[in-house]
């Protein structure tokens, strides 16, 4: 479970509600008791519910029921029902709707990618990068995990990933073995992940025996060729495809023999359509 602190929950609310809801105040309806319900119009893989519930309870509202993150909702299915003071209901409405729409958009997009991949490779995986929209990293992470995806890198401090931009600063930027051996010495408990930008680099990297080799922006044919020769060069190395991988392009790589894909595409998926209904208690 991704943990969002109370300060982070407060920040999600404060973007919209710090001054209260003027319309509710002007109508003098804030004292009434009521209900709020959130519905997913088009259905799909759900996320953001646990965050939304924390936002609701922060406003002093009571959760009556809620679906679980990662569940598959039918079109029009209710995700959350909560009750409480009408002023708080109206304050939380849009901020919570935004969290649910963005989160569900991310999780459902990734869920569709995983379904496509696992039709071909039941053991296939998709890892999502740290290149999330600024300020959304934790929301993105909970959405990715809800859909069954992997977190590629939560940050740059806990994993090794050798890019060309690192190698540019080495005395010999083509010395893959030297770089990988140095990384193993100085980070002995970590897997060594490297990225290649060309087939020539990929072959040189494989000969240096990394744990994981990322192929960046390789064509399907190039990826297939590397996948065919990799077992003889580095039998224990896992291959991954990255760069331009999305729901549209993924199908072009399903015959190359690689089962791990790395992407940031879900973060930029269209938001889900969340319908919100607020009603006074007497009408329920």
UniProtKB/Swiss-Prot annotation:
InterPro entries: Aldolase_TIM, ModD, NadC/ModD, Nicotinate_pribotase-like_C, Quinolinate_PRibosylTase_N_sf, Quinolinate_PRibosylTrfase_C, Quinolinate_PRibosylTrfase_N. Its EC number is 2.4.2.-. Gene3D superfamilies: Aldolase class I, Quinolinate phosphoribosyl transferase, N-terminal domain. The keyword Glycosyltransferase applies. One of its GO terms (molecular function) is nicotinate-nucleotide diphosphorylase (carboxylating) activity. GO terms for biological process: NAD biosynthetic process; quinolinate catabolic process. It comes from the Bacteria. The keyword Glycosyltransferase applies. One of its GO terms (cellular component) is cytoplasm. It is an enzyme of class 2 (transferase). Belongs to the NadC/ModD family. This is Putative pyrophosphorylase ModD. It comes from Escherichia coli O157:H7.
